[in-house]
């Protein structure tokens, strides 16, 4: 199996010591014995990729399941006890009784004529939702392939290459979701879909390019070998312009041709005044991010250790399960928060539903700062700390877009379902 070295160097056994002179080569030799192993080729990495502490990962999953069960119970109560009961009572009334009841309505039923009023900065919301779905799809598909063993550490760079490939391909989904959401908000108007598609193609990549360029200038200024070569920047720009942008425009075209989602109720021209709240609504939105963070903070430690401490991370099966649980928790959290806002007659739910789940990014960034202070003591100098914070910022922006898109779309479905069950003239 193994061939012997053709011309080994023989040492003179009579030479006990060797006099080493300056600027002269030093000759030495060694022996290597190759022993054929009975380990199969597909299993050659098992000894290095065996991850200890599986109980910790299972504890993380169990913790996430407890959070999901708690939120699912709240959603169950909302649907079966509150919503179904109110809808049943409402539909059993005749028209005269309904007219009288409309004057005595309270809670979410009062905002029926305002709940689908267009939000502020609708184009930005559509762009962020489209980019979020693209990032989420890329993460799920990449982790799935890694869990199935298609991306092995034996081939360096396969994980990053796979992420870039799936991200560019899923530009179709980003353009489709953003443009169709845009047409839904503007009641079927397809004008401006090209502009929305371009913004989707440029928003998140532009943020990433700005952060990476700034950090790369720091590396160039410190004469670091870790700086990204200029040629690689050119390649990334060409991939973005020649593949990602056209695919996003194609997705936007299909989104413009697809039928928009029709609102079940009409919107009044004059917006309804929102009653004063006891507590700021955004305070509740920011606090909602603690629940999604609780589902992934244990797994986050292993990921950060792999990125910054050089430890091997190959439990992609656990990571895939945690990612799915995170999506479920984000959907449930945003749905519950949206219902709570509607119950206090706050019809401005669009952005709040996005950030109810997207606020998990704030806690991840705070965790990153904590990890920098207490765990990454080997980092020296402000340049290293700036690089770490810059990459962490890029990561949390991606997480905010992905989780926010999940929360918004689940809330949109819930609100549409809720008010489509109410029959109003």
Where are these regions (language model features)?
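Hydrophobic alpha-helical transmembrane segments corresponding to the first two to three helices
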Residues: 46-220, 253
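Membrane-embedded alpha-helices of multi-pass membrane proteins, especially ion channels
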Residues: 68-82, 134-150, 170-183, 207-222, ...
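Extracellular secretory-pathway ectodomains of glycoproteins
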Residues: 266, 270-278, 289, 298
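Hydrophobic alpha-helical transmembrane segments
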Residues: 2-15, 103-113, 142-146, 179, ...
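Extracellular (lumenal) ectodomains and large extracellular loops of multi-pass membrane proteins
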Residues: 1-59
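Transmembrane alpha-helices of multi-pass eukaryotic membrane proteins
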Residues: 55-69, 122-134, 154-171, 189-208, ...
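Interhelical loop segments of eukaryotic multi-pass membrane proteins
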Residues: 81-109, 142, 149-162, 186-199, ...
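TerminUS-proximal long segments
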Residues: 14, 18-19, 371-425
